[in-house]
C-alpha cells in the first residue's frame, strides 16, 4: 500500500508538504551546471571554443534568492571561463569549478558560511551529484536527470535542466518562506 502524503498547491502544481518544510530551512542553494543551469549540450566552434546556453528565467530565480538573503553557489566538475562571467552577472560569489569530488567544495561552503547540512538545497542531474545530494537538507533532481538519481531525490522538477528547472526550485524555496511575492519587479 502506498503512503499518502499531504500536498500544497503551488504555481508548479501540488508539492509534498515535506518538501516545502525542507525548503523553508534553506539558506544556501548549490547548483550543478551542465544539465542543470545549461541543457547539458556543449556547442563547439571552429576554433575549438565551447559555448553553452543559460536560461534567463533561471538567472532571475537566482537573483530573487540572493535578494531575499539566500546564498547561491555553483559546484561543477568542468571548467569554463564563461561561467565566471555568468556568476559575476548574477552576483554568485561562490564558484567551484573542476570539482571531481564535490563533497570537498560542499564542506568548504558549510564551513565558510557557518551552515548546517539541513540549511542547504542541491540541484543536480547526474551521479556525480549524488554524494552531495545525499548530505543536504533538500535534494533536487531536474526532470531529465539520470534515471538512477530520480528516485533518490526529495523533489524532481517538472521542468528539464537548462529550461527553467532552477527557477522552479528557486520559486518553491521562496514560496515556502513566504518570499515569492517580494520577487516581483526585480531585474537581472
What kind of feature is each model-predicted range?
Residues 15-16, 58, 102:
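Amphipathic coiled-coil/heptad-repeat helices and related helical stalk/stem segments
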Residues 6-8, 13, 49-52, 97:
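Short, flexible loop segments at the rims of nucleotide/cofactor-binding pockets, characterized by
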Residues 62-86, 96-97, 133:
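Substrate-recognition element of Asp-dependent hydrolases with the DxDx(T/V) motif
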Residues 25-27, 70, 118-119:
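Short coil/turn segments at beta-strand junctions that form active-site/ligand-binding loops
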Residues 37-67:
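A positional/architectural concept
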Residues 23-42, 133, 166:
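Asp-based phosphoryl-transfer active-site loop
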Residues 51-52, 82, 88-90, 94-96, ...:
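Mg2+-dependent phosphoryl-transfer enzymes with acidic/Ser/Thr/Gly-rich catalytic loops
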Residues 1-31, 179-188:
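Non-catalytic pre-domain segments flanking phosphatase-related domains
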